[in-house]
């Protein structure tokens, strides 16, 4: 390692170090706890001193085995590169092959594994900085409809306007803006060559003008590039800046590689073909979301002493002010849904699109849901829960909801948030503002200490509801909301037809029409889930009131 340090100090440019290091630097790189902490620390110091980063190994945790009946497994074979190398080969892929004639797994590095998928429209946050942006949006949004006005409902018109605006923006960006990265490289090269020429001679007037123009272009294009790579990285806790641009770019490349699924394990076999994996994913989520849940036990809500919303005006007409406030809370950098638009589009173009958005909200209030399904769609992406993810259960489904549907649920969530505390007991603290979930942890700690002091044989039971959001029974939810005093209009809003397509390696699959469950990343879903959990909570309180359960202590 000392020799590698000396060589690294003398050399510049892209670096790669590949081989059997016979060392580990993390405890999880070994299958048991027999660790040499001193050597692990030295290895970490070497990695930090040489400014190298390890390439992600796809599908494997360990690369060496001692081949015993109870084997010791370790990650001894690694590939380290410099940041320059990772930027030069953003589509690389490192995998391990079978250990045929050795106790080490051979490593296979592919430097150009371009992930092909259909190109969807995505709103770029740097577009509003470009000249002519609002003019393009206004022309596209106010383009004549391809059908008569009498036949067009609000949602059909809104869907057409969003699609037409997306099409026009994509065309405008290709013609007027072009490739920001390529233009920036050209501007820098022109500046560099003119700087070199200026070292040996006086520049001509037209060369000086070109140099000034190239430098101005470099500044503007660098700003656009920072916005672009920050949006791709999905990192919101760091601001745009020259120091962070490279980090954003590396993170975006890492997200792209980590999100790719090359194989999928089912109960019967392991799938490798894209169409077979897509069918397996569709069947899994069709059974989970597209099948109505069976409610075997019915609850008499009259016995539970549940509160009522009363005259809270949950379903009054939507105002322009509350919709604008909801738009102000929409994030600018979150991954977009099927329409491709982010919250920034609504904020910048609000004077242009306001009339059609308000018309759509008025149709929702009037329960005119014709064609609402066009703007109530979502994409579902699968995020790894662990590095060696293999089956569908090893991925976390996240919904990317259509921007208008998300705006609607944001408005409804804002209305419900101020009243949800009155509808649930204090023992519920998740997803409720001004209440801390840590208080429940503290109550469990106090209970355990009290049981320990009492010396009474007892058991603390932790219940984990698998796929909690995805398996909520709609009939139970609607019966509960009706008993809580929610109007029929609110129930119709919640029951609005929704559909989802699962994204596998960048390509959307078949449509799944929802029949149960709550959508992840929907602003309204956490609040509805809290109300659902108030049912079991009220059952426990009823059992306590009838003497079937007792408290450990009056304060717990």
Spans of features found by a protein language model:
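Conserved polymerase palm-domain catalytic core
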Residues: 465-556
């Amino acid at each position: 390692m000392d020799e590698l340090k000396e060589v690294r100090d003398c050399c510049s440019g892209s670096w790669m170090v590949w081989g059997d290091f016979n060392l580990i630097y993390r405890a999880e790189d070994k299958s048991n706890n027999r660790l040499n902490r001193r050597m692990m620390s030295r290895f970490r110091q070497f990695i930090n001193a040489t400014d190298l980063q390890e390439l992600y190994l796809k599908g494997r945790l360990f690369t060496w085995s001692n081949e015993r009946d109870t084997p010791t497994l370790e990650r001894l074979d690694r590939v380290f590169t410099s940041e320059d190398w990772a930027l030069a080969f953003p589509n690389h892929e490192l995998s391990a092959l079978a250990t045929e004639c050795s106790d080490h797994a051979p490593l296979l590095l592919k430097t150009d594994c371009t992930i092909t998928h259909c190109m969807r429209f995505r709103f770029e946050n740097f577009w509003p900085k470009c000249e002519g942006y609002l003019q393009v949006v206004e022309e596209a949004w106010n383009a004549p409809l391809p059908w008569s006005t009498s036949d067009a409902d609000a949602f059909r018109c809104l869907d057409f306007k969003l699609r037409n605006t997306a099409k026009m923006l994509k065309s405008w960006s290709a013609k007027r803006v072009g490739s920001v990265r390529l233009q920036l490289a050209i501007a820098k090269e022109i500046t560099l060559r003119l700087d070199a020429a200026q070292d040996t001679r006086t520049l001509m007037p037209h060369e000086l003008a070109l140099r000034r123009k190239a430098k101005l272009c470099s500044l503007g294009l660098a700003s656009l590039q920072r916005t672009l790579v920050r949006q791709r990285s999905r990192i919101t806790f760091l601001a745009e800046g020259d120091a962070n641009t490279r980090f954003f770019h590396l993170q975006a490349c890492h997200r792209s590689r980590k999100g790719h699924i090359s194989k999928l394990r089912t109960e019967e076999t392991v799938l490798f073909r894209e169409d077979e994996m897509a069918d397996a994913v569709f069947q899994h989520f069709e059974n989970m979301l597209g099948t109505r849940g069976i409610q075997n036990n019915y609850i008499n809500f009259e016995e539970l002493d549940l509160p009522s919303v009363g005259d809270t005006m949950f379903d009054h007409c939507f105002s322009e002010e509350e919709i604008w406030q909801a738009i102000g809370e929409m994030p600018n950098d979150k991954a977009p849904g099927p329409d491709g638009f982010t919250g920034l589009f609504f904020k910048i173009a609000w004077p242009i699109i306001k009339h059609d958005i308000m018309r759509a909200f008025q149709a929702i209030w009037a329960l005119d849901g014709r064609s609402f399904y066009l703007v109530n769609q979502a994409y579902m992406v699968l995020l790894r829960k662990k590095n060696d993810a293999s089956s569908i259960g090893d991925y976390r489904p996240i919904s990317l909801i259509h921007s208008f549907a998300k705006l609607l649920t944001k408005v409804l969530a804002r209305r419900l948030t101020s009243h949800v505390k009155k509808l649930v007991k204090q023992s519920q603290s998740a997803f409720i503002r001004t209440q801390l979930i840590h208080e429940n942890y503290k109550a469990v700690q106090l209970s355990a200490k009290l049981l320990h002091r009492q010396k009474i044989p007892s058991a603390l039971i932790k219940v984990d509801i698998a796929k909690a959001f995805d398996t909520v029974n709609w009939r139970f939810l609607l019966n509960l909301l009706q008993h809580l005093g929610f109007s029929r209009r609110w129930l119709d809003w919640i029951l609005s037809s929704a559909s989802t397509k699962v994204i596998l390696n960048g390509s959307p699959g078949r449509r799944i029409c929802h029949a149960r469950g709550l959508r992840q990343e929907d602003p309204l879903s956490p609040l509805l889930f809290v109300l659902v959990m108030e049912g079991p909570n009220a059952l426990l309180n009823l059992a306590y009131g009838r003497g079937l359960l007792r408290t450990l202590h009056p304060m717990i």
